[in-house]
Amino acid sequence: MIAQPPIQFDRTTGVLQGANPWERLAAVALLAGSKVSSLFSHRGYNACANLLRKTLSEREIAVRLNDDAVFVFPYGDGYWSKLLNRSFKYEDELELLFQDSAGIDYTLLDCGANYGYWSVLVSSRPFGAHKAIAIEPSSVNYARLANNARANGGRFQAMHCAIGAARGTARLSGTKHEAFSIAGGAGAGGEVVPVIALDDLIDDGIVAEGGKYLVKLDVEGVEIEAIKGGTRLLRGDTVIMCEEHGSDPHHTVSRYILEQTPLKLIVYDPASDRFETLTELSLLDRIKVASHVGYNVFGTASAFWEDRFHRMNANAARRVH
């Protein structure tokens, strides 16, 4: 049986093409569900969308993110179908940094890339056409990541491995494609995957020591191990972007960055529309309002990137006045 071509959706115009009547009705439901559930941080949306997906034929959707970026995923996917809602912004605080950095010569290290959303976007012309290296441990996710690299002209590199403290292997476990993890240890079962450290990328000649890097660490519970494995990379002109879990009242990742590394800890505060440099963690108690959501925090030892955050704050102040 020949696979059907992907449904096409343009986030700029809202035009949906190539869908049959039932798929169009499903799109209406997915859009409405996103708008309603956005009022409570999309709680329950993924599960409801995945139930709806069971009624659909297996098919992909190609979402045009901008005039130079196409992101392909299974139609009805609970995690990514929020993109059908044109007002939805995925990890808005990361997009602010990437947009502001369009004119800077940096490389994105997209660790835990999933299907490659950020690599697709950052390598596109409106975001500066940057070099991106997308790193994903799951073989199932990696196949979709590689497909997105091909769909965008092969302009970013995809690597099939996990990020940890040192080179080796680990077992990848989990039931949700957006939450596979090597944190369970050798007894967790699941797929055996290669592991590399961030500094191995320097040793292997994949990245150069002394460049500018934005490092997204979406590594599901091994953020601290990943930071430990990137000592050389992180002491240069690098920013790490880590997920601070809403369900963690101790702010474990942020606490480690603040107390155990030379990095400055920075967080985006939606209330002030500013990136705040933290010397203690009480602000996170206010920002982390939903236990099922991840909140990105930033760490850097770079005066260059610190200045960029200050510039973004100045630009935000000008927008208000």
Which positions does each model-derived feature cover?
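S-adenosyl-L-methionine
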Residues: 1-139, 143-155, 203-210, 270-276, ...
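Short, glycine/acidic-enriched loop or turn micro-motifs at the edges of active sites
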Residues: 113-115, 139, 163-165, 219-221, ...
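A short helix->loop->beta-strand "cap" motif at the edges of active sites that frequently abuts
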Residues: 128-130, 236-238, 261-263
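Core alpha/beta nucleotide-donor-binding catalytic domains of modification enzymes
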Residues: 139-142, 146-177
